[in-house]
Amino acid sequence: LAISYISLINHINSLGEKYQHSDRMILNVTDESHIITANPLLAKFLVKGSKMWRKLGIWLWLATQNMDDFPNEAAKLLSMVEWWELLNVSASEIDEINRFRKLSEAQKTMLLSAKKSDRKYTEGVVLATNMEALFRVVPPSLFLALGMTEKHEKAERRQLMMQHGYSELDAALEVAARIDKARGIA
């Protein structure tokens, strides 16, 4: 994993150098990033890279579902993060975030105020140097239906496929129509 990731990062770095005079930014997005930062060599590599990448127009985005999965070795990297986008976090997750970014009581209160309503919306908080804001994401029903990966959600689509002879897309469209109806917009 380390060799593959370093190769990928080196390629992204080469693209940044090649296009450094372009006004187009490069986003380096790593999902499940706690897996990468658990390797002390990779964490140090990303710290060094991300300091240089700002000059090349490369922005490092790290995503994870669980802050407690980040090892202490990731502290230096996470302390450099300029923008934190936090979706519907719990009190225990706030403690984990506080390991890497000191939060004020007002910020903790704002984080705890973010809510989630299944199949409707998710609220979150943006924390940056010059901005703190509560936001709500209301995805279109089709996006929700296509993104449903829980076992019972997949079983619902499978049942529609079997019952009506639908393709997977047709089943997702049916689920989306049901979500629209439940939202009162159909």
Predicted regions: what is each one?
Residues L1-M110, S141:
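Conserved P-loop NTPase motor cores
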Residues D95-K116, K120-M131:
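Electropositive, surface-exposed helix/loop patches at the edges of structured domains
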Residues L1-K18, S22, E85, S117-A186:
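Conserved P-loop NTPase motor module
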